[in-house]
Regions:
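A short SAM/SAH-binding and catalytic strip from SAM-dependent methyltransferases
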Residues: 124-144
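A short glycine-rich, Lys/Arg-flanked "PGG" loop and its adjoining helix->strand segment in the class I
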Residues: 143-156
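N-terminal auxiliary segments of SAM/dcSAM-dependent transferases
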Residues: 1-30
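Conserved alpha-helix/loop element of class I SAM-dependent methyltransferases that forms part
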Residues: 44-67
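Conserved SAM-binding strand-loop segment of SAM-dependent methyltransferases
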Residues: 106-117
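Conserved SAM/SAH-binding beta-strand->alpha-helix loop
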Residues: 95-96
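Conserved SAM/SAH-binding loop
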Residues: 75
Length: 244
């Protein structure tokens, strides 16, 4: 697994976040993939407030307790809301530009760090991974590595709150059946590359995990997984705890 942070020259999302923070607007943050048509991420969405968050994210922030770690914190929308609720939160991200913006926006404890970096240590009661938190595993084969790493950072009575989506809807035919190649790669594995203005990021793997698969992998890792909120479009929020 990658353990380092991004260089500013290869941080398109961070550059877009910085522009929006400084000027209230940003150019197109393009999302490329070998599997889908080109898409665009609305940068304003990264600055959303509680009322504009999907119910899965709202529920995660409501459920968070104790010493909270927000992984992949982006522009800091979740960390800021937790602070407003009076909760203690540490925000980490691999984007130095995003981390600077979070500090300027008032997030009190920010560190530019990759969660897989061995020098990152701590014990947290709640670990948040939102906006498709399983994504950072990249591949299904790496999901146990992610979960085991989170176990190291979780207090004995702690919890992981992570969201994802089941991409099976992409393979649904007109009759409502799902045309998925069970002999091919796991259907939730995708690749992305982000481009902002003249800044092109490195291609990266991203993992969407269906609830049944997430529960099975959690069980392999000595963890219990419970789906506590379901969204409108195959998205969900899971609560993961240590198996007693």
């Amino acid at each position: 697994m990658q353990t380092d942070t991004l260089s500013i020259s290869q941080d398109p999302m961070g550059a877009a976040i910085r522009d929006f923070h400084l000027t209230g607007k940003a150019g197109r943050l393009r999302v490329l993939s070998s599997m889908f048509e080109e898409d665009e991420m609305p940068v304003a969405h990264l600055f959303r407030t509680f009322k504009d968050m999907p119910r899965t994210e709202q529920r995660a922030l409501e459920e968070a307790y104790g010493n909270v770690l927000d992984i992949g914190a982006g522009a800091g929308c979740h960390a800021l809301e937790l602070q407003q609720q009076g909760k203690s939160v540490k925000a980490i991200d691999i984007s130095p530009l995003s981390c600077e913006v979070m500090k300027e926006r008032g997030v009190k404890d920010v560190e530019c760090k990759n969660v897989f970096c061995p020098t990152f240590i701590g014990q947290f009661d709640t670990i948040l991974l939102l906006m498709n938190g399983t994504g950072i595993a990249g591949k299904l084969s790496n999901l146990p590595n992610l979960l085991n790493r989170l176990k190291q950072l979780m207090s004995k009575d702690g919890q992981i709150l992570i969201d994802s989506s089941d991409l099976k809807y992409i393979y649904e035919d007109e009759d409502g059946a799902f045309d998925i190649d069970l002999n091919g790669p796991y259907y939730g594995e995708v690749d992305y590359q982000m481009v902002y203005r003249n800044i092109k990021g490195e291609p990266f793997d991203w993992l969407y995990t269906d609830p049944t698969m997430l529960k099975a992998v959690c069980e392999q890792c000595g963890l219990k997984c419970e789906i506590i909120e379901e969204g409108d479009h195959y998205d969900y929020l899971a609560k993961i705890t240590l198996t007693i």
